[in-house]
Curated annotation (Swiss-Prot):
PROSITE patterns: FPG_CAT, ZF_FPG_1, ZF_FPG_2. It comes from the Bacteria. Gene3D superfamilies: 1.10.8.50, MutM-like, N-terminal (3.20.190.10). Binds 1 zinc ion per subunit. Keywords: DNA damage, DNA repair, DNA-binding, Glycosidase, Hydrolase, Lyase, Metal-binding, Multifunctional enzyme, Zinc, Zinc-finger. Its cofactor is Zn(2+). SUPFAM superfamilies: Glucocorticoid receptor-like (DNA-binding domain), N-terminal domain of MutM-like DNA repair proteins, S13-like H2TH domain. GO terms for biological process: base-excision repair; DNA repair. This is Endonuclease 8 2. It comes from Mycobacterium tuberculosis (strain ATCC 25618 / H37Rv).
Amino acid sequence: MPEGDTVWHTAATLRRHLAGRTLTRCDIRVPRFAAVDLTGEVVDEVISRGKHLFIRTGTASIHSHLQMDGSWRVGNRPVRVDHRARIILEANQQEQAIRVVGVDLGLLEVIDRHNDGAVVAHLGPDLLADDWDPQRAAANLIVAPDRPIAEALLDQRVLAGIGNVYCNELCFVSGVLPTAPVSAVADPRRLVTRARDMLWVNRFRWNRCTTGDTRAGRRLWVYGRAGQGCRRCGTLIAYDTTDERVRYWCPACQR
């Protein structure tokens, strides 16, 4: 499940392979943009904003969102391409051709590079941005004090980058139920700072870890652990499905 850290890591990987290089192939397999060909353009930069990713050339910006199942694959040719590919980019890297393939992307569009900021203008503070603003994020969080905390954390207009995994993990380490109101959080500034710290330490990892134990099966506190013992107190982790999202919590550690 891609969240802000995954998108940040993906952007860093694409940047390393594409930035400063000329595109030798641009094959977009989305009907609306199938006629767009950026071959010959130089990739200036690749950036992320929350869960959004932008590949910028001189005139255009390739905007994508992974949503639930999307990914970008990078490698020397050939990188496997099948019916799930939404875009194929190639660029020369010294004497080798690099191929980048966007697979199962939830959103892919080509927009004016100089106006691409408009599509993310609604987002709250980006948890992984250099200009991260915890004061603004905390202020956004408490605007609706009766709102369930999980709902507020998942609202990208409040702060950008949190998905369901981090939402559940943050509720656990903060000792609050996902269904508790925002007003139950004693220190909103501390909560958003924890959110930033969680994503920051995971920004170079493909397998996120919130417990500090990177061994397989021990990386998360509650997410995906329904019916297993809480790592702190041993109480069985509970779960519920609301609005197509699964929520996990420890009945003893969270109130």
